[in-house]
């Protein structure tokens, strides 16, 4: 599931931290953007957390996602589609 999420998000143009684990950081680098992105995703029905300083170093703000084996491919695709809509709206992709 995490691989599917990573592949779709990368193909859409998102900057992801490398790794092979269920926690997938989506890098946005700006704290206010991360907060707004998380808020707009919630409006889309997708709950994520924006991490920014002091939780992560300044300039390294991100959206923290955690993909589970319990998520269906349809749920993951729905989340990615929401990321894409918000990402385009906010000029991230």
Regions inferred by a protein language model and the residue ranges of each:
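PLP-dependent enzyme catalytic core of the Aspartate aminotransferase-like
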Residues: 43-47, 54-93
């Amino acid at each position: 599931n995490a691989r599917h999420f990573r592949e779709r998000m990368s193909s859409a143009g998102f900057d992801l931290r490398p790794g092979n684990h269920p926690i997938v950081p989506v890098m946005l680098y700006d704290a206010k953007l991360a907060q707004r992105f998380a808020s707009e995703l919630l409006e889309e029905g997708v709950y994520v957390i924006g991490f920014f300083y002091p939780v992560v170093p300044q300039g390294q703000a991100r959206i923290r996602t955690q993909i589970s084996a319990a998520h269906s491919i349809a749920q993951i695709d729905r989340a990615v589609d929401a990321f894409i809509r918000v990402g385009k709206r906010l000029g991230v992709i």
